[in-house]
UniProtKB/Swiss-Prot annotation:
Top-rank lineage group of the source organism: Bacteria
Gene name linked to the record: rseA
Family label: Belongs to the RseA family.
Subunit-structure text: Interacts 1:1 with ECF RNA polymerase sigma-E (RpoE); this inhibits the interaction of sigma-E with the RNA polymerase catalytic core and leads to a decreased expression of sigma-E-regulated genes. Interacts with RseB with 1:1 stoichiometry. The liberated N-terminus forms a complex with SspB and RpoE.
Name the UniProt record assigns to this protein: Anti-sigma-E factor RseA
Entry remark concerning the domains of this protein: The N-terminal cytosolic domain interacts with sigma-E. After degradation by RseP binds to SspB, targeting RseA for degradation by the ClpX-ClpP protease. The C-terminal periplasmic domain interacts with RseB and is also the target for DegS.
Species: Haemophilus influenzae (strain ATCC 51907 / DSM 11121 / KW20 / Rd)
Length: 195
């Protein structure tokens, strides 16, 4: 509880005077006070030194006090690296992967050759062509379509446009009938001559 009050006192909060009196008398609270200030200065990057001057001496003492366990060395012959290379398994493994390695190297060389030629050709073609846009921003019909409820629609026909359209269709039908009659008359004449 005293450490919480000590932390609050460091943050600038009001604490009881009993805590201040205890801080002046108790060495453990003074050590906590010191460690809290050290932590605060390190967190605020106010101090680069956060280890005490006697840190190395403490570590040396702790290392000396540590129990040393002795392990009996069991003499087991370990294979030498030369033996591992000469084992039957390694020889079979090398024999299995050697052709695959050769094929992989050949495929890599071919890939580099093809990509190199293509990139070389693309650079030459790109220099001869006019600049084309990377991103086509207009629709295929090259017209911007308005998107609004009140926008006039280009698809609805007026009465004048409908009348012109029906006249055009009528003229096309008359032309078709005339050509059909002329063609049928020409067929009748040629068929009568053949008889």
């Amino acid at each position: 509880m005293q450490k919480e009050q000590l932390s609050a006192y460091m943050d600038g909060e009001q604490v009881e005077t009993d805590l201040i009196d205890a801080l002046l008398r108790d060495e453990e609270l003074q050590a906590s006070w010191h460690s809290f200030h050290t932590v605060r200065s390190v967190m605020r990057k106010e101090s680069a030194v956060f280890l005490g001057a006697d840190f190395t001496a403490k570590m040396a003492d702790l290392i000396e006090l540590e129990d040393v366990k002795k392990v009996d060395v069991i003499a087991v012959s370990q294979p030498e690296p030369e033996d591992a290379h000469n084992s039957v398994f390694m020889q079979k493994l090398k024999a299995f992967f050697a052709p695959m390695t050769q094929v992989a190297v050949a495929a890599g060389v071919c890939l580099v050759a093809v990509l190199g030629v293509q990139s070389f050709n693309n650079k030459n073609d790109a220099s001869n062509l006019p600049e084309t846009p990377v991103l086509q921003t207009l629709p295929f019909n090259n017209a911007v379509q308005e998107v609004s409820y009140n926008a006039p629609s280009k698809d609805t026909l007026t009465s004048d446009q409908l009348e012109k359209k029906s006249r055009r269709i009528g003229a096309m039908l008359q032309n078709y009938e005339l050509q059909r009659r002329m063609h049928s008359d020409a067929l009748d004449v040629s068929s009568s001559q053949v008889r």
